Amino acid sequence: MKALRATSLARIGAAAALFGASLAAVSATASAADLVRGEQLFHTCAACHSVLGDGIGPDITGIYGQPAAMRPGFNYSDALKQRGLTWTEANLRAFIHNPQAFVPGTLMSFPGYERTADIDDVLAYLKSLK
């Protein structure tokens, strides 16, 4: 009887480990898909912004966690400069959703993304740019 329980427990443990590994694989795949989709969505942003420093808007490479309105070579709006923001996840999320509502008077003409999934994906892409 004890041998049967030990065997059953071993099988349950193996099944749990396999299940955990499959969840990790699905999670990694979802994260990669979000990043890829975020890069695709960024093409809208790339009309002005770049990751190479040659856009009409400021370069956004490494923007996550940085102070807003501090990139050299760009004339930011007084509205953005006066807010004293740091590009945290919450601030980026609000700005990407509706730039004019978050910083009235910003030079950003993009109206924003409505869907939470789109914002999540763009954030994943922005965080990857280092």
Give the residues covered by each predicted segment:
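N-terminal secretory signal peptides that target proteins for export/translocation
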Residues: M1-L9
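C-terminal segment of classical bacterial N-terminal signal peptides
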Residues: L9, G13-A30
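Periplasmic/extracellular electron-transfer cofactor-ligation site
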Residues: A33-N75, K81, L85-T86, H97-T106, ...
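Absolute protein N-terminus
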Residues: M1, A14, S31-D34, K130
